[in-house]
Amino acid sequence: MLLAASVDDVEMMRILLAAGADPKIQTATKASTIMAATALNHGIGESLVTEAEAIDAVNLLLSLGVDPKGETTVGENALFGPAYRGWNTLLAQMIDLGVNVNAVSKAGTTPWRAANGQGDRLGGVLVNTEGADLLVKHGADPKLGVACESQNRCRDLK
């Protein structure tokens, strides 16, 4: 179920559900199927999945009672993937569902830093000003976390 969710394959998710798969399953690090569907562990260019497909997968999981508000053992939640990828419709949906806009990962990244190009992922990340502004509008504190420069993990965005 996690693999199907991570590629937002709604058809396969429905097949697995019909066969008894648990939509609330999590990884060892507590990543949920919703986190997988919101591209928590994907960088730009790693997947051909579209934001619309991700929204369809997330909506299916929400209809099955999967809680969108969880955090992994490293402190990431369902806002990080959309913030990194520039999926602002999905980002807004997760914010509206009450996902913590001020989550701070063990690497010092927040959803705001991820959107602003200051996250801890090397390569394949964009500067998502609209997403960063959306997060601030909903209470994100830009002072939280640690900029990638202090981690020596910045991408060359030039």
Over which residues does each language-model region extend?
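Amphipathic alpha-helical segments in well-structured domains
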Residues: 30, 54-55, 108-109, 128-132
